[in-house]
């Protein structure tokens, strides 16, 4: 059967064009005008995009499925227009052996409704200095390495990890955090920490480890990717490193682009995340970094928690914010429609073809004949409200609930099959 998406504004090759998209046998067959098919999806007035790509999600499965599981996490991704995600390995047990990795990959495929690529850990159990067998993990299905949630604390361990990752052509995606400097902090070091009387987090906890790792990456030649950069100095370090030819890429999270520490209204656990919300100066630096190419992509760091884990104030709340279901719409509304900081084409690139390119996910994040029919359709014209009852994730831990947005997802397709349709829970 042939399905045609008619009369949409299609994002293809960095441009927006008025076109139809023809789908057959799970693939894009053609993009053009006056195309016909057995089934017609009317996209008049809608944006037709490649399925978005999020290289940073936490599905808590196995081990903490009361927070999220593969099924609900992938449904949340589809609700946000994402058709490809990278799942972090901070689950229980950590997939640090070939058997555990194979099982994880199999579970992702069986339970997920989007394409789920699985990270392996940089170190065994994510908390030791012992390296797993990277070659075996890659053969079992790992597409990259990360200890996200934990910084690799010793330079020697990271140096050895980068050497082995380079040998096996694996990306090292680092959560840059020096625990001795983080020192059980909660909010960014500044006036807000003083106002709330909460332990501060110095930016040095992030920047010193980035500086260390950039030197190690230069020495080893590994592809070093930095998760959720959040400070002006971090951006400057990456900018200098790229100018020096170091093989480094990095991502920014939607919440660090949209919010600052000044937006924390009170001691509210929904605003507790790691890295913490930073200063206005840091926020501006992130936006400039995206626009000048220092920051390569946007990734959500979707980190769901049970409702009770985010209540009772920031001191005892868990770190983390959801993002899969709110990323595109909140970013589009704020930075494209309202403030005109960047274009729709730029936003779509940072959320689709760029993450796919950086991580070597061939045929993801693009609409081209012969590629998988992974498609997202968005409504840019009508205002809607973000409501808890509409979330597909088990986690409702986002401060964006109640916000009026444009860019709601109308439909998401994976391999030509509809996996999300607005109005259907």
Curated annotation (Swiss-Prot):
Zn(2+) 2 binds at residues 148, 175, 228. Pathway: Pyrimidine metabolism; UMP biosynthesis via de novo pathway; (S)-dihydroorotate from bicarbonate: step 3/3. Catalyzes the reversible cyclization of carbamoyl aspartate to dihydroorotate. This is Dihydroorotase. CDD domains: DHOase_IIa. It holds the Pfam family Amidohydro_1. It comes from the Bacteria. It catalyses: (S)-dihydroorotate + H2O = N-carbamoyl-L-aspartate + H(+). InterPro entries: Amidohydro-rel, DHOase, DHOase/Allantoinase_Hydrolase, Dihydroorotase_CS, Metal-dep_hydrolase_composite, Metal_Hydrolase. Keywords: Hydrolase, Metal-binding, Pyrimidine biosynthesis, Zinc. GO terms for molecular function: allantoinase activity; dihydroorotase activity; zinc ion binding. The active site is at residue 301. The gene is pyrC. GO terms for biological process: 'de novo' UMP biosynthetic process; purine nucleobase catabolic process. The keyword Zinc applies. It is an enzyme of class 3 (hydrolase). Its EC number is 3.5.2.3. Substrate binds at residues 58-60, 90, 274, 305, 319-320. Its cofactor is Zn(2+). Belongs to the metallo-dependent hydrolases superfamily. DHOase family. Class I DHOase subfamily. It comes from Lactobacillus delbrueckii subsp. bulgaricus (strain ATCC BAA-365 / Lb-18). Disulfide bonds: none annotated. Binds 2 Zn(2+) ions per subunit.
